[in-house]
Amino acid sequence: MNPEKDFAPLTPNIVRALNDKLYEKRKVAALEIEKLVRDFVAQNNTVQIKHVIQTLSQEFALSQHPHSRKGGLIGLAACSIALGKDSGLYLKELIEPVLTCFNDADSRLRYYACEALYNIVKVARGAVLPHFNVLFDGLSKLAADPDPNVKSGSELLDRLLKDIVTESSKFDLVGFIPLLRERIYSNNQYARQFIISWILVLVSVPDINLLDYLPEILDGLFQILGDNGKEIRKMCEVVLGEFLKEIKKNPSSVKFAEMANILVIHCQTTDDLIQLTAMCWMREFIQLAGRVMLPYSSGILTAVLPCLAYDDRKKSIKEVANVCNQSLMKLVTPEDDEPDEPKSVAQKQTEPNPEDSLPKQEGTASGGASGPCDSSFGSGISVFTSASTDRAPVTLHLDGIVQVLNCHLSDTTIGMMTRIAVLKWLYHLYIKTPRKMFRHTDSLFPILLQTLSDESDEVVLKDLEVLAEIASSPAGQTDDPGAPDGPDLQVNHSELQVPTSGRANLLNPPNTKGLECSPSTPTMNSYFYKFMINLLQTFSSERKLLEARGPFIIRQLCLLLNAENIFHSMADILLREEDLKFASTMVHTLNTILLTSTELFQLRNQLKDLKTLESQNLFCCLYRSWCHNPVTTVSLCFLTQNYRHAYDLIQKFGDLEVTVDFLTEVDKLVQLIECPIFTYLRLQLLDVKNNPYLMKALYGLLMLLPQSSAFQLLSHRLQCVPNPELLQTEDCLKAAPKSQKGDSPSIDYTELLQHFEKVQKQHLEVRHQRSGRGDHLDRRVVL
């Protein structure tokens, strides 16, 4: 520093002392400056006051010499003390050089800067609030200072500033929020602690409504919640808890829509604390905001559904996620199925962008788990649609929801509980919004069929419920069963389309007397037949599924849908099946279900007597397909008490190729005759006179069997049949003889028998072609 330079009104002694390396001498100089400035204040000499401050600032505080800078800092503090209440007029000039020293490399100098600013702020009190942002900015840097003394000094200044803000009603929150939003993304734990402490203070001040600006800082708060420091995480939990308490207290003023996507992101993070907290917030948002959250359903489901499959290690997250899922599902109502009103161009332009609710920070999406479904939605969170205003009607966007559900159902790595939840959602949507959901049915259908192969019975049951709802919903009824379900869907018609003309031929085979095979129950729609076709195609391509789950699936469908329609339609389809071996296997499966399942009790009773035209039509329809398997055809005749026709069929067995499989099925039929299902048949053996063809049919089966356990069983049963002469009483002899049950006049049994012969001939030809025997149709017994 140039000693010859004029520093007036500062005296040479003051200048010399300010430059001294000893603190005590600089302190003496500060007292002299304080006295000098007081005199200027008394004289109202603002020019000299400004000159003193400028000199201390430019020549000392911003000097290249460290001791001069220290002197300048203590001098500026002395000026502030001398100015007292008038210091507010000069705060900019007093504060700026001190804040510059906050960046000094010398830790002692940074400490003196803290001390000087503390004295300046202490005198000015509320007058410093217009300069709050620069003070906060400087303090946020010192909070992370490596020197403990500097940090201690900054904490004293920080507490003073908090007291001033707390007692003042003039704090500029609007001007402060941008700085807070920027600083909240700091990764330094001390800076984070500083930020959190300030938010806690601001939340506690009644006159400051920080809740209005929560969307600006919520993302940053959740990132701080993942800090490694236990104390910081605890502080952040307290802050978030206070905010949530305020939200519950006054939900009408909360900007739920602007924070929804932020929660969606943090509900997917790998940090358990962040995920649990975000999920708890999401639960409260859904319950408090209600349908305002519906436009964000796809994002919420993306976050919530995977959590439902968590194990006990994350039980808390799983439980909260389940509540979120259930609450969100309840928000969907039938009114969401109403047609969407077309939007004008002006409305589309004024709609907010969902990305606007996210802070524009690089770290926004950090920590989010990249799920297997992310690729379906592009980048970021842009797929979710934001609610425009609270007054505007809330629209449920099914496209995004269905895409998320389809994605999770397609993912084979996803947990069982998640898959069940997805299926529950689909079922719920088909119940509440069937018209809109049927636009997506063609895209959902393949994955729903594929889900039938799931390892979990519970998943398969829910899947069948969805498929049954699709097949029975009135919304699925279309004039053209092959028409696409939506204008913009890519549909694989080879799987679902059933041409109208082809279907008519399929349902009404030529030369069929009194036969109508088209399911006509009003609860069935055009998708019912598509479902049956695709289900049989699935069984055909996945024989293991048919073997392991076929009976289970069909029995459940008989409970969920009309059993008669299921058997009717499957018989129709199998009638045209080109794979004869599969047709035979499928008929055997259906027959076993028909004869043994409790779910088919009513259908068995309907077929038992063939009293109605409908039951006769059903019998004819089943019979034509049952012809793919000779033994099942006989069992169907036993069930329907067509004993004469059963006997005629057994007579035809002499012309068939008797194989081990054939004899095994005869064996099983004999075992079945001993079951409760055929109790009525066994009782009819007491009336041999009126049931001669029953006896002949059973003896025919006996003659087909080799000397096996089944042979012994049936033989013993027939030996128990009493002599009809011994059973006749005097009343019976006097009474007119009863005629046996006659064949129904509406059924052409001759034509049915011809059909049986035709089908069996086709089977024989196919078997011989496979074995390389060509047209050599000699009968061969394989034992």
From Swiss-Prot:
Keywords: Acetylation, Endoplasmic reticulum, Endosome, Membrane, Microsome, Phosphoprotein, Repeat. Expressed in brain, lung, kidney and testis with highest levels in brain and testis. One of its GO terms (cellular component) is cytosol. HEAT repeats lie at residues 5-42, 89-126, 171-208, 212-249, 439-476, 561-599. InterPro entries: ARM-like (IPR011989), ARM-type_fold (IPR016024), Vac14 (IPR026825), VAC14_Fig4p-bd (IPR021841). The modification N-acetylmethionine is found at M1. One of its GO terms (biological process) is phosphatidylinositol biosynthetic process. Residues 774-778 are annotated as: Mediates interaction with the PDZ domain of NOS1. The modification Phosphothreonine is found at T11, T500. It is found in: Endosome membrane; Microsome membrane. Its main location: membrane. Disulfide bonds: none annotated. It holds the Pfam family Vac14_Fig4_bd. The modification Phosphoserine is found at S518, S744. One of its GO terms (molecular function) is identical protein binding. Forms pentamers. Component of the PI(3,5)P2 regulatory complex/PAS complex, at least composed of PIKFYVE, FIG4 and VAC14. VAC14 nucleates the assembly of the complex and serves as a scaffold by pentamerizing into a star-shaped structure, which can bind a single copy each of PIKFYVE and FIG4 and coordinates their activities. Interacts with NOS1. Scaffold protein component of the PI(3,5)P2 regulatory complex which regulates both the synthesis and turnover of phosphatidylinositol 3,5-bisphosphate (PtdIns(3,5)P2). Pentamerizes into a star-shaped structure and nucleates the assembly of the complex. The pentamer binds a single copy each of PIKFYVE and FIG4 and coordinates both PIKfyve kinase activity and FIG4 phosphatase activity, being required to maintain normal levels of phosphatidylinositol 3-phosphate (PtdIns(3)P) and phosphatidylinositol 5-phosphate (PtdIns(5)P). The C-terminal domain (residues 523-782) mediates pentameric interactions and is necessary for the formation and maintenance of the PI(3,5)P2 regulatory complex. Belongs to the VAC14 family. PANTHER family: PROTEIN VAC14 HOMOLOG, TAX1 BINDING PROTEIN-RELATED. This is Protein VAC14 homolog.
